[in-house]
Amino acid sequence: EISCSLVGSEMCIRDSLKGNVGTAWQSQRVEFADLPAPVLFTTNCLMPPAASYADRVFTTGPVAYPGMMHVEAAPDGGKDFEPLIQRALELGGYAAATDTTGTFTTGFGHSAVLGVADTVVDAVKQGAISRFFLVGGCDGARPGRSYFRDFVQQAPDDSIILTLACGKFRFNDLDLGTIGGLPRIMDMGQCNDAYGAIRVAVALA
């Protein structure tokens, strides 16, 4: 679920964009196997595609893989995603409404968070928010790695958790509630969005 009412997003005007499907990088070969849709990789982390979905993989930008269709940028920077769109139409998507593992509000990139900075600062001044924690980083596939989850569960109730990268999948199923209408867990994106988290930290310092 993309946060529109809280922070707004240009993506929210796209009726066909519903949100995020899937979890950490190491699960893609299982999660994509039965996904009735094409998959577009724009950055890390691409694993060697399994035969069950290899014909649905597209890449663009800095990521590519032998045998997969790569969408190149035109001289003006534009990209033609017509082949991907046609593949999506062919596959048709889910035949009926399908629940995955749950619903989690996302879309808190640095521009979105800084767009409501006044609300956040007011909550701090009023004592509703005592501190911010950035819990970000990649995560391995080994079961039992619980540091991220333990940390977040023990964080004070008046704290906000900014998170990014695959480490978030260790705890983003937790319902930590909200503070002043803001979710206590704010998903800022993937590894590549670490710079955005730094910008938010500096702005709110």
Regions found by a protein language model. Give the residues of each.
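Accessory "access/gating" subregions that flank catalytic or transport cores
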Residues: T98-S130, L134-L176
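Gly-rich Lys/Arg/Thr-decorated short loops/hinges at beta-loop-alpha junctions or inter-strand turns
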Residues: P62-M68, Q86-F108, I129, P183
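Structural motif
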Residues: S3-C4, E31, V124, Q153
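Single conserved hydrophobic/aromatic residue that forms the stacking wall/gate
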Residues: E1-G8, C12-I13
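Catalytic or ion-translocation cores adjacent to nucleophile or general acid/base/metal-coordination motifs
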Residues: E10, R14-K79, G140-A203
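Generic structural signal of hydrophobic/aromatic residues within well-ordered alpha-helices
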Residues: F81-A88, V113, V120, F151, ...
